[in-house]
Design a protein with these regions (language model features):
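Extracytoplasmic
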Residues: 263-420
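Membrane-embedded transmembrane-helix bundle of lipid-linked glycan/lipid transferases
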Residues: 1-278, 325, 367, 371-374, ...
């Protein structure tokens, strides 16, 4: 996301989740003195998640629900009629209710999910979830590349936790996040899809990224279990001598195993290719989707004509909000997700009729909106919202504007029909 960088939110998530786990365990064990440092740190972590991207905060809430349920089970199993048990149970229940409320309440309007639909069958989605393909090459042409070693290590890690009956909630978190991914990738648009995954805009890419977090934890546990088993096997067959060289050799062997596994499971090339494909959209070229070379040419010349206090009428879906960040001129629309200011509605809907509709010029002159910028929206972003701006897009051909600076089809215009 340009406004909210989703990956930054996901990068903060592991620390926020770890802080929640430490805080809850401190409460359960009655180590309240630790809360003086844990709670402020946790609040900062959660605020950081929310600022980076709101759906990262929702992701934290979803991820820790199985952990909180496990902690409630532990409190119930070890129940003692004591104040500490009552406090611990109450705090965990409150935290669980908060997580559900965060998932239910922090979500954009339904229109924000219009872009994302189901892209595969349920069976294919489950297969991709288990084998960590997760559309890793979709940016380059819908090619599924399963990671068999990663899948094996993850399933081995899950089996190891089940065998040891330890931290089973991690498996549940992995399955829960995977279930949300399957919904976003395979379930048709409807009330159920909107209920379950609209906090992520029903965007399967966001949830594909999220699946990796519990998957990596499980695969790390699986790799650790394998290395541990290999070391035990080797040690059992070595002479029992008190020689530190054995330990050193085994540590080196362990490091080699880990590095080899990392080499075979890394998706460096896939990440490189996807990053390269996305980076092309941010280059200033004639065909660039975000800001083309013609649009940038117009933006750079706007300060030569538009005074600091004037406002430029614009359609926020066409890239024109970059005018504000790049050359510091005010606009009628700074971001397509912001609510349209009602006072500008006559301009949006009827600028083309400025010669015959006095309401248009009244708004133009009262608010110093003497300019209009015309850019392109080549991918037709926000198709449902474009009718809000029909009056401006048609004004170019209606004789109510005077071109001030143009480059190709892009241009800055003076709303000359409203000049006294």
């Amino acid at each position: 996301g340009v406004l909210y960088p989703n990956l930054i939110g996901y990068a903060v998530m592991p620390a926020a989740i770890a802080l929640i786990i430490l805080t809850v365990r401190a409460v359960v064990k009655g180590r309240y003195q630790k809360l003086w440092t844990l709670i402020p740190t946790l609040l900062l972590g959660l605020i950081g998640c929310a600022l980076a991207h709101p759906n990262a905060l929702v992701s934290v809430a979803v991820f820790v629900v199985p952990f909180l349920l496990a902690m409630i089970g532990k409190v119930v199993r070890t129940y003692r009629k004591s104040r500490q048990t009552a406090i611990a149970g109450g705090i965990i229940l409150a935290a669980l209710a908060t997580c559900v409320a965060v998932w239910y309440m922090i979500r954009p309007g339904e229109f924000a999910s219009n872009t994302w639909t189901s892209v595969m069958s349920e069976g294919e989605a489950v297969y991709q979830f288990l084998f960590f393909g997760l559309e890793n090459a979709n940016q380059l042409g819908d090619k599924f590349e399963p990671s068999y070693i990663m899948a094996f290590l993850t399933l081995w890690g899950a089996g190891y936790l089940i065998y040891k009956r330890r931290n089973l909630w991690i498996i549940t978190s992995w399955i829960l996040v995977g279930y949300l991914w399957v919904i976003s990738a395979s379930v048709e648009r409807g009330p159920f899809r909107m209920l379950m995954v609209s906090p992520w805009y029903t965007d399967h890419f966001r949830l594909a990224t999220l699946v990796v977090l519990p998957g990596v934890i499980l695969s790390g546990i699986g790799l650790g279990a394998i290395v541990q088993s290999v070391l035990k096997f080797v040690l059992a067959r070595l002479p029992r001598v008190n020689d530190t060289r054995y330990t050193q050799v085994l540590l080196v062997a362990s490091a080699v195993i880990v590095l080899v596994a990392a080499g075979f499971t890394s998706r460096t090339q896939a990440v490189h290719d996807a990053t390269l494909a996305v980076s092309k959209e941010y280059r200033i070229e004639p065909s660039s989707v975000i800001v083309s070379s013609d649009e940038m040419n117009v933006i750079e010349h706007i300060p030569d004509y538009v005074p600091q206090g004037d406002i430029i009428a614009n359609n926020p879906w066409d890239g024109s909000p970059y005018i504000y960040s790049l050359v510091h001129r005010n606009l009628t629309g700074y971001h397509f997700d912001f609510k349209t200011d009602e006072k500008y509605r006559p301009i949006y809907k009827h600028l083309k009729d400025a010669k015959t509709d006095p309401e248009v010029c009244k708004v133009v002159n009262e608010n110093n909106v003497h300019w209009y910028v015309h850019f392109k929206n080549p991918l037709n972003f926000g198709p449902d919202a474009q009718n809000l701006y029909d009056g401006m897009s048609d004004a170019v051909e209606n004789g109510v504007l005077t071109p001030v600076y143009t480059s190709g089809e892009m241009g800055l215009y003076r709303i000359s029909a409203c000049d006294s």
